[in-house]
Amino acid sequence: MSTAVRICVCGDEGTGKSSLIASLVKGVFVANKIQAVLPQVTIPPTTGTPENVTTTIVDTSARPQDRTTLRKEIRKSNVILLVYSDHYSYERVALFWMPYFRSLGVNVPVVLCANKSDLVSDGNAAQVAEEEMLPVMAEFREIDSCIRTSAKEQKNVIEVFYLCQKAVTHPIAPLFDYKEGQLKPACVDALRRIFFLSDKDQDGYLNDQEMQDFQQKSFDKPLSQEDLDNIKLTVSKSVPSSSTDKGLDLRGFLQLNKLYAEKGRHETIWIILRKYHYTDSLSLEDSFLHPRFDVPDYASAELSPAGYRFFMDLFLTFDKDNDGGLNDRELAALFAPTPGLPHSWAETSFPSTTVRNEAGHITLQGWLAQWSMTTFLEPKTTLEYLAYLGFETPNARETTTAALKITKPRKRRRRPGRVDRNVVLCYILGSSGAGKSSLLDVFLNRPFDTLYHPTIKPRQAVNSVELQGGKQCYLILEELGELEPAILENQAKLDACDLICYAYDSSEPDSFSHIVELRKRYPQLDELPAVYTALKADRDKTTQRSELQPDAYTAALNMSAPLHVSVTWNSISELFVALAEAATNPSTAFPRSEEPPADRASLYMALGATACAALAAFMIWRRSTSNAA
C-alpha cells in the first residue's frame, strides 16, 4: 500500500483550484486575492488521513504556456483532482481534460469535483449529480468518485482531499467492475480464500462465532448482535435464495462485499484484504509468503509442535467421511486456498511418497510424514503453504516461522552421542536391480511387486520409525536413479544427507562390486556414516565377484557385517529401525579403518593443567625453603 499520496489538482482557470487548497491549509476561506498557482503543499501523517499517509498537493495552471509543467506534474502524481465550477468548465471535462489524461498514458484515479456549490441552490444538488456527474463517470471509468464542494462555505473541503487520499490507499478499480456491476475475479478469489480461512469447521457457513472471530481479526473490535442481525437481514434481502439460518454462506459473503463496493464503502473491503496480507494488486505479500528463515550450515529445519498441531488439525477437519484418509475430493478442498499441490509433491507423484490406506488415500501418519519431509528438504515451501492455509499464532508479531524450528548443527558427525534431529535423510545406493525400489515400497507398507521397474528420476519415501526407547523419528529414504553421479558429486547434497545405506543383491554375484567401485569413485562418501545391507536374503546366497567378500570388507573397515534382509520377511522393519538409529547416532556407523584421532584439545588442556600444578608446587617448595633459610 502507498505510504505517500501525491495529488495533482487540475482544471480550467477560475474554477477555484487554488482556493480549495488554501481553504484546506488555512481552515477558512481566503477572501483576499491569492496567487494563480500555489506552491506545493505537504501534509504530514495524521489520525485523520487514511492509513496515516503523507500527502503532497500540487496546484497547476491550465494556461497553454504552462502545459509542459502540467504534463510533468500529472505524470508524477498518483491521483488527479479535476475541478470544474460552471457549465463551460463542466463540458471541458469530457471534451478536453479526460482525453488529455488518457493521451499522456497515465493510469491513476481521478476524483471529479464540482466546486463553487454555493452558487447552486441545494434543491438542485441531486439534479446536478444525476445530470452532470453520473454520465461522465459512466463514460470515463478512471473517475473514482465525485463530490460537490465550496471553498467559500468550507463545504466538503476536507472531504474532497480525503477522497483523493482514499482513491490511492483504497482504490476501487482492482475490486469492482462498474461496467459489469460485479466484483472483479481477483477480488472474488481473495474473498473466497478469506471465507475459507474464516470457516473453521468447514461446513460452508460462517456461524455467529466465526463471524465474531472474522470481525475481531479484520477490524479489531467485536460485532454487536444488532449489527450481526442487520448483516444477515441485508444479505437475505439482496440474495433471497441465500438462507442465513446456519450463518453466512460464500454467496452471501461475496454479495455483502459487493454491496460495500456499490455503496462506496470499498475501504471496508480493503481493510479486510490487508488484514489477510493482500497487496494492492490482490496478491499475497511476499514477506508473508516468504518470511526470512535461514538454516545454518549442517543444521536442518523441522516442524515445531505448533506446526505438527496445525497440520494434524487440518487433516482432521477435511477428513469429512472419517475414514482416516484424504481422498481426491477432500485434498482438493483442503488445497483450495493455495495454488494447488506444492511443485515438489507433483514432481514426486504424491501421495506415492508416503503412507496410504488400502484405498490409496493418504493417512494422518502419511500426511504428517510428508510435511516433515517437505520441511526438511524445502522449508520455504512449507512456510509458503502455512501462509496459504491460514496458520496463525497467538502472538500477532510472530510469523509462520513459529511453525518451524532449526536443529543444532551436526558438523562433527564422529562425536559420540545422538544428533538433535527428528527427521533424517538416508540415500540408498546400490546396483540396478539390487532391490532398492522394493525396499522403498515395503517401507510404505506397499505389497511386493515381482516386476522390475528401473528408477529413472530420484524417488523418495518417508515414514515414521520408532527408535529404541519409544522415541519417534521420520526417516526419509531416497533412491537417486540416473541422477546418482550428479548428487554424489554435489557436496551440499552430501552435507544434507544423514546416512548412506549401501544395498546389494546377495543372490547376484556382481552386485557388491558396484558398492566397492562407488566408494573408490567418490571418496567423499567416507565422510558419511553408512550401513551395509544384503537384500533378497530369501534367495540363495552367492559368492560375490569382489576382492573381499562383504563380511570381510566391512570387517576390514571395523564396521558391522551387512544386515541380511528380504522385503518378503516381516522382520524387514528392523532394518528401518537400524537405519534410523545409525542416522541419529552417526558415530556408530562411520566407514573407516583407523582408530579415531586423539582429542588433541583435551590432551593440551591436560598437559597445561599438569604443568601449572607442577609450577605451583615448585613455587611453594621454593618459598618454604627460603623461609627455612
UniProtKB/Swiss-Prot annotation:
Binding residue positions for GTP 1: 11-18, 59-63, 115-118
Intervals, Mitochondrial intermembrane compartment: 622-629
Domain Miro: 2-170, 421-585
Cytoplasmic side: 1-600
Swiss-Prot/TrEMBL keywords: Calcium, GTP-binding, Hydrolase, Membrane, Metal-binding, Mitochondrion, Mitochondrion outer membrane, Nucleotide-binding, Repeat, Transmembrane, Transmembrane helix
Single GO term (MF): GTPase activity
Binding sites annotated in the UniProt record for Ca(2+) 2: 319, 321, 323, 330
GO biological process: heme transport; mitochondrion inheritance; mitochondrion organization; mitochondrion-endoplasmic reticulum membrane tethering; phospholipid homeostasis; regulation of mitochondrion organization
Localization, UniProt: Mitochondrion outer membrane
Superkingdom of this protein's organism: Eukaryota
First-listed, main subcellular location of the protein, grouped into a coarse class: mitochondrion
Membrane topology qualifier: Single-pass type IV membrane protein
Annotated GO CC locations: ERMES complex; mitochondrial outer membrane
Role noted for this protein: Mitochondrial GTPase involved in mitochondrial trafficking. Probably involved in control of anterograde transport of mitochondria and their subcellular distribution.
Protein's recorded name: Mitochondrial Rho GTPase 1
The organism of origin for this protein: Neurospora crassa (strain ATCC 24698 / 74-OR23-1A / CBS 708.71 / DSM 1257 / FGSC 987)
